[in-house]
Amino acid sequence: MAKLLVIKASMVDKSISFSEELTNRFVKYYLESNPNDEVITLDLNEVPMAQKTLNGSNLKNFFNQEDSDFYIDQLKSVHKVIFSCPMTNFNISATAKNYLDHVLVANKTFSYKYSKKGDAIGLLNHLSVQLLTTQGAPLGWYPWGNHTENLKGTFEFMGTKVVTPILVDGTKIPENANKTPVERINEFDSVIRLKAKEFAALPAVDWKPLEQ
């Protein structure tokens, strides 16, 4: 039995959120394959940590046990992560950024100690990660705003194995503007079902400290 951590980083009301519908659909299909897996949901709107932004006044105390170590340990305790995030002003959401700032900690999720070339080595190489992203514009309209690739590179930096992301794009263009989240996500249903089945089939690997 695997432990699956579902991280939600959308600030939009759940009833009208494309990210919420995409995530719920994916988890539903995942559980059809692995009904006994343990699912842990982390809604970043509901935890104080994700409301705290790194700045000059809190730098000394930002990486503490409650806000940082707890969530790093959580990542080490699970086998798979689903990270759901909409594009917000050409970037990841503010809560997603706050979360990542708390867990991207040297010698805890990545390290330069064991590198022979001087680059960082990720310490979460047990994790498999599925990114579920949404955006109003079609992919490529704003090349500087590829939040999906931003997330993919960030999780890979921590050593995780990121499978092919699912991006639901173009939700705000005229032909899609009047579609509900359910209607728009229905158009990706076959892809979601397939990727959820593939993700469910990945092995559950326990975290181990990197051997020196």
From Swiss-Prot:
Cofactor: record remark: Binds 1 FMN per subunit.
Record flagged with keyword Kinase: no
InterPro entries: Flavodoxin_fold, Flavoprotein-like_sf, FMN-dep_NADH:Q_OxRdtase_AzoR1, NADH:quinone_OxRdtase_FMN_depd
Catalysis performed (reactions): 2 a quinone + NADH + H(+) = 2 a 1,4-benzosemiquinone + NAD(+); N,N-dimethyl-1,4-phenylenediamine + anthranilate + 2 NAD(+) = 2-(4-dimethylaminophenyl)diazenylbenzoate + 2 NADH + 2 H(+)
Keyword Zinc-finger carried by entry: no
Annotated keywords: Flavoprotein, FMN, NAD, Oxidoreductase
Residue sites binding FMN per the record: S10, S17, F18, S19
Cofactor requirement: FMN
GO molecular function, one term: electron transfer activity
EC id: 1.6.5.-, 1.7.1.17
Enzyme class: oxidoreductase
Description of how the protein assembles with itself and partners: Homodimer.
NCBIfam families: PRK01355.1
Role summary: Quinone reductase that provides resistance to thiol-specific stress caused by electrophilic quinones.
Family to which the UniProt record says this protein belongs: Belongs to the azoreductase type 1 family.
Name of the molecule in the record: FMN-dependent NADH:quinone oxidoreductase
Organism: Malacoplasma penetrans (strain HF-2) (Mycoplasma penetrans)
